[in-house]
Protein backbone atom coordinates (compact mmCIF):
# COMPACT_ATOMS: atom_id res chain seq x y z
CA UNK A 1 0.00 0.00 0.00
CA UNK A 2 1.15 3.55 -0.71
CA UNK A 3 0.89 6.54 1.59
CA UNK A 4 -1.59 9.06 0.20
CA UNK A 5 -0.59 12.68 -0.21
CA UNK A 6 -3.20 15.17 1.00
CA UNK A 7 -3.71 18.87 0.53
CA UNK A 8 -4.50 21.06 3.54
CA UNK A 9 -6.41 24.33 4.03
CA UNK A 10 -8.10 24.22 0.62
CA UNK A 11 -10.50 21.94 -1.15
CA UNK A 12 -10.46 20.58 -4.64
CA UNK A 13 -12.86 17.71 -5.43
CA UNK A 14 -10.14 15.91 -7.35
CA UNK A 15 -8.00 15.47 -4.23
CA UNK A 16 -8.37 14.41 -0.63
CA UNK A 17 -7.72 17.21 1.84
CA UNK A 18 -7.14 17.29 5.58
CA UNK A 19 -8.15 20.14 7.90
CA UNK A 20 -7.56 20.69 11.60
CA UNK A 21 -10.93 21.10 13.36
CA UNK A 22 -10.50 19.91 16.96
CA UNK A 23 -7.77 19.99 19.57
CA UNK A 24 -7.02 16.73 21.36
CA UNK A 25 -8.80 17.94 24.50
CA UNK A 26 -11.88 18.64 22.38
CA UNK A 27 -11.69 15.16 20.85
CA UNK A 28 -11.70 13.76 24.39
CA UNK A 29 -14.71 15.90 25.26
CA UNK A 30 -16.63 14.61 22.23
CA UNK A 31 -15.58 11.01 22.94
CA UNK A 32 -16.80 11.20 26.53
CA UNK A 33 -20.11 12.67 25.41
CA UNK A 34 -20.54 9.89 22.83
CA UNK A 35 -19.94 7.30 25.57
CA UNK A 36 -22.48 9.02 27.83
CA UNK A 37 -25.11 8.58 25.09
CA UNK A 38 -24.61 4.85 24.67
CA UNK A 39 -28.33 4.20 25.14
CA UNK A 40 -28.84 5.94 21.77
CA UNK A 41 -26.24 3.91 19.88
CA UNK A 42 -27.76 1.76 17.17
CA UNK A 43 -26.15 -1.62 16.54
CA UNK A 44 -25.47 -2.10 12.84
CA UNK A 45 -24.01 -5.61 12.87
CA UNK A 46 -24.81 -8.59 15.11
CA UNK A 47 -21.34 -10.07 14.66
CA UNK A 48 -19.00 -7.12 15.23
CA UNK A 49 -19.00 -4.08 17.47
CA UNK A 50 -20.32 -1.61 14.89
CA UNK A 51 -22.70 1.15 15.98
CA UNK A 52 -23.95 4.52 14.83
CA UNK A 53 -25.04 7.52 16.86
CA UNK A 54 -27.29 9.29 14.40
CA UNK A 55 -29.34 8.32 11.36
CA UNK A 56 -27.27 7.32 8.33
CA UNK A 57 -28.88 7.56 4.89
CA UNK A 58 -26.63 4.87 3.41
CA UNK A 59 -28.13 2.45 5.93
CA UNK A 60 -31.53 3.84 6.88
CA UNK A 61 -32.82 5.25 3.58
CA UNK A 62 -32.02 2.29 1.33
CA UNK A 63 -35.33 0.46 1.72
CA UNK A 64 -37.59 3.15 3.17
CA UNK A 65 -36.81 6.83 2.84
CA UNK A 66 -39.60 7.69 5.28
CA UNK A 67 -37.95 5.46 7.91
CA UNK A 68 -34.75 7.47 7.49
CA UNK A 69 -36.61 10.74 7.99
CA UNK A 70 -38.33 9.33 11.07
CA UNK A 71 -34.99 8.22 12.53
CA UNK A 72 -33.60 11.68 11.83
CA UNK A 73 -36.53 13.34 13.61
CA UNK A 74 -35.92 11.18 16.66
CA UNK A 75 -32.15 11.48 16.98
CA UNK A 76 -31.44 14.99 15.66
CA UNK A 77 -32.60 16.71 18.89
CA UNK A 78 -30.22 14.48 20.89
CA UNK A 79 -27.33 15.37 18.61
CA UNK A 80 -28.21 19.07 18.69
CA UNK A 81 -28.43 19.10 22.49
CA UNK A 82 -25.02 17.50 22.89
CA UNK A 83 -22.99 18.44 19.82
CA UNK A 84 -24.45 21.70 18.53
CA UNK A 85 -21.08 23.43 18.97
CA UNK A 86 -19.37 20.73 16.91
CA UNK A 87 -21.98 20.85 14.15
CA UNK A 88 -21.63 24.62 13.97
CA UNK A 89 -17.85 24.51 13.87
CA UNK A 90 -17.96 22.07 10.97
CA UNK A 91 -20.67 24.07 9.17
CA UNK A 92 -18.81 27.37 9.51
CA UNK A 93 -15.56 25.68 8.54
CA UNK A 94 -17.14 24.49 5.31
CA UNK A 95 -18.49 27.96 4.58
CA UNK A 96 -14.94 29.28 4.79
CA UNK A 97 -13.59 26.39 2.73
CA UNK A 98 -16.24 26.40 0.01
CA UNK A 99 -17.05 30.10 -0.14
CA UNK A 100 -20.79 29.34 -0.30
CA UNK A 101 -23.66 29.24 2.22
CA UNK A 102 -23.71 25.96 4.17
CA UNK A 103 -26.67 24.72 6.22
CA UNK A 104 -28.25 21.54 7.52
CA UNK A 105 -31.22 20.13 5.61
CA UNK A 106 -34.46 20.46 7.59
CA UNK A 107 -35.61 16.88 7.08
CA UNK A 108 -32.26 15.18 6.85
CA UNK A 109 -30.12 13.60 9.53
CA UNK A 110 -27.44 15.71 11.11
CA UNK A 111 -23.88 14.44 10.76
CA UNK A 112 -23.34 11.61 13.23
CA UNK A 113 -20.89 9.08 14.54
CA UNK A 114 -19.49 5.75 13.38
CA UNK A 115 -18.42 3.69 16.38
CA UNK A 116 -16.37 0.50 16.11
CA UNK A 117 -15.27 -1.47 19.15
CA UNK A 118 -12.18 -3.69 18.95
CA UNK A 119 -11.38 -6.36 21.52
CA UNK A 120 -7.75 -7.23 20.78
CA UNK A 121 -8.58 -10.25 18.64
CA UNK A 122 -6.54 -11.01 15.53
CA UNK A 123 -8.09 -9.34 12.47
CA UNK A 124 -5.05 -9.60 10.21
CA UNK A 125 -7.21 -11.24 7.54
CA UNK A 126 -9.38 -8.10 7.26
CA UNK A 127 -9.50 -6.84 3.67
CA UNK A 128 -10.62 -3.23 3.10
CA UNK A 129 -11.23 -4.13 -0.55
CA UNK A 130 -14.38 -6.00 0.52
CA UNK A 131 -15.79 -2.63 1.68
CA UNK A 132 -14.80 -0.53 -1.34
CA UNK A 133 -17.54 1.84 -2.46
CA UNK A 134 -18.50 5.23 -3.85
CA UNK A 135 -20.63 7.48 -1.63
CA UNK A 136 -23.92 7.28 -3.52
CA UNK A 137 -26.23 7.64 -0.51
CA UNK A 138 -27.69 10.82 -1.99
CA UNK A 139 -29.54 8.60 -4.47
CA UNK A 140 -31.52 7.19 -1.53
CA UNK A 141 -31.81 10.36 0.55
CA UNK A 142 -32.59 12.62 -2.43
CA UNK A 143 -34.11 10.37 -5.10
CA UNK A 144 -34.84 11.79 -8.50
CA UNK A 145 -32.04 14.33 -8.64
CA UNK A 146 -28.28 14.38 -8.55
CA UNK A 147 -26.64 17.21 -6.61
CA UNK A 148 -24.54 19.69 -8.58
CA UNK A 149 -21.56 18.71 -6.40
CA UNK A 150 -21.01 16.41 -3.45
CA UNK A 151 -18.63 16.04 -0.55
CA UNK A 152 -17.97 13.56 2.24
CA UNK A 153 -16.11 14.26 5.47
CA UNK A 154 -14.71 12.18 8.31
CA UNK A 155 -13.44 13.68 11.57
CA UNK A 156 -11.51 11.18 13.75
CA UNK A 157 -12.44 11.47 17.44
CA UNK A 158 -10.97 8.30 19.01
CA UNK A 159 -8.67 5.57 17.72
CA UNK A 160 -7.93 2.00 18.83
CA UNK A 161 -4.38 0.81 19.34
CA UNK A 162 -2.68 0.83 15.97
CA UNK A 163 -4.67 3.85 14.80
CA UNK A 164 -7.14 4.06 11.93
CA UNK A 165 -7.07 4.86 8.25
CA UNK A 166 -8.90 5.44 5.00
CA UNK A 167 -8.12 3.34 1.93
CA UNK A 168 -8.51 5.01 -1.47
CA UNK A 169 -8.20 3.63 -4.99
CA UNK A 170 -7.32 6.13 -7.75
CA UNK A 171 -10.56 5.76 -9.69
CA UNK A 172 -13.46 8.21 -9.80
CA UNK A 173 -17.12 7.27 -10.13
CA UNK A 174 -17.66 9.64 -13.06
CA UNK A 175 -14.84 7.99 -15.03
CA UNK A 176 -16.09 4.39 -14.96
CA UNK A 177 -18.59 2.45 -17.03
CA UNK A 178 -22.05 1.60 -15.66
CA UNK A 179 -21.05 -2.06 -15.31
CA UNK A 180 -17.92 -1.23 -13.28
CA UNK A 181 -17.38 -3.80 -10.50
CA UNK A 182 -15.98 -1.80 -7.58
CA UNK A 183 -15.25 -4.80 -5.37
CA UNK A 184 -13.47 -6.69 -8.14
CA UNK A 185 -11.39 -3.63 -9.01
CA UNK A 186 -10.45 -3.04 -5.38
CA UNK A 187 -9.46 -6.67 -4.91
CA UNK A 188 -7.08 -6.60 -7.87
CA UNK A 189 -5.57 -3.11 -7.66
CA UNK A 190 -3.43 -1.46 -4.96
CA UNK A 191 -4.98 1.11 -2.67
CA UNK A 192 -3.46 4.21 -1.13
CA UNK A 193 -3.52 4.61 2.65
CA UNK A 194 -4.35 7.79 4.51
CA UNK A 195 -3.66 7.48 8.24
CA UNK A 196 -6.15 9.44 10.28
CA UNK A 197 -5.03 12.08 12.77
CA UNK A 198 -7.30 12.85 15.71
CA UNK A 199 -9.05 16.17 15.25
CA UNK A 200 -8.14 16.51 11.56
CA UNK A 201 -11.10 16.24 9.21
CA UNK A 202 -10.63 14.42 5.91
CA UNK A 203 -12.66 15.81 3.01
CA UNK A 204 -13.26 14.43 -0.48
CA UNK A 205 -16.12 14.48 -2.95
CA UNK A 206 -17.13 10.94 -1.96
CA UNK A 207 -16.83 9.71 -5.53
CA UNK A 208 -13.31 8.33 -5.27
CA UNK A 209 -13.40 4.60 -4.61
CA UNK A 210 -12.67 4.20 -0.90
CA UNK A 211 -13.16 2.06 2.19
CA UNK A 212 -12.65 2.09 5.94
CA UNK A 213 -9.03 1.15 6.43
CA UNK A 214 -7.28 -1.14 8.87
CA UNK A 215 -5.39 -0.58 12.06
CA UNK A 216 -1.62 -0.76 11.65
CA UNK A 217 -1.52 -3.77 13.99
CA UNK A 218 -3.24 -7.16 13.77
CA UNK A 219 -4.85 -6.99 17.22
CA UNK A 220 -6.32 -3.51 17.74
CA UNK A 221 -8.09 -2.77 21.00
CA UNK A 222 -10.34 0.12 21.91
CA UNK A 223 -12.74 2.32 19.97
CA UNK A 224 -12.67 3.87 16.53
CA UNK A 225 -15.02 6.86 16.65
CA UNK A 226 -15.49 9.28 13.76
CA UNK A 227 -17.86 12.21 13.26
CA UNK A 228 -18.97 12.19 9.67
CA UNK A 229 -21.43 13.23 7.05
CA UNK A 230 -21.96 14.38 3.50
CA UNK A 231 -22.70 17.55 1.58
CA UNK A 232 -24.85 18.25 -1.47
CA UNK A 233 -24.74 21.47 -3.47
CA UNK A 234 -27.77 23.04 -5.09
CA UNK A 235 -28.69 26.53 -6.31
CA UNK A 236 -28.98 27.80 -2.73
CA UNK A 237 -25.63 26.52 -1.50
CA UNK A 238 -24.50 23.41 0.35
CA UNK A 239 -26.59 21.18 2.62
CA UNK A 240 -24.82 18.96 5.15
CA UNK A 241 -26.44 15.68 6.21
CA UNK A 242 -25.71 12.06 6.99
Spell out what each predicted region is.
Residues 111, 148-151, 200, 225:
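Residue-level detector of short, conserved catalytic/binding motifs and their immediate flanks
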Residues 1-75, 81-88, 92:
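N-terminal auxiliary "cap/dimerization" subdomain that precedes the catalytic jelly-roll/cupin core
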Residues 176-242:
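Catalytic core of Fe(II)/2-oxoglutarate
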Residues 22, 114-119, 134-136, 155-159, ...:
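Short, flexible loop/turn elements at secondary-structure junctions
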Residues 121-195:
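Catalytic core of non-heme Fe(II) oxygenases with the double-stranded beta-helix
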Amino acid sequence: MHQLNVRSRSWDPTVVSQHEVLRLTECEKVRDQVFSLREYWKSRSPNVGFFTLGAASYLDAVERRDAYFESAREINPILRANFDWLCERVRKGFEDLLGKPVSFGDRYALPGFHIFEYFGTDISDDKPSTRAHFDMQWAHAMPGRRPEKTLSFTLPIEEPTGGSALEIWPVHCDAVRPDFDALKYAATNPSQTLRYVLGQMVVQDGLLLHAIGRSSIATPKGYRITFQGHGAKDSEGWKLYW
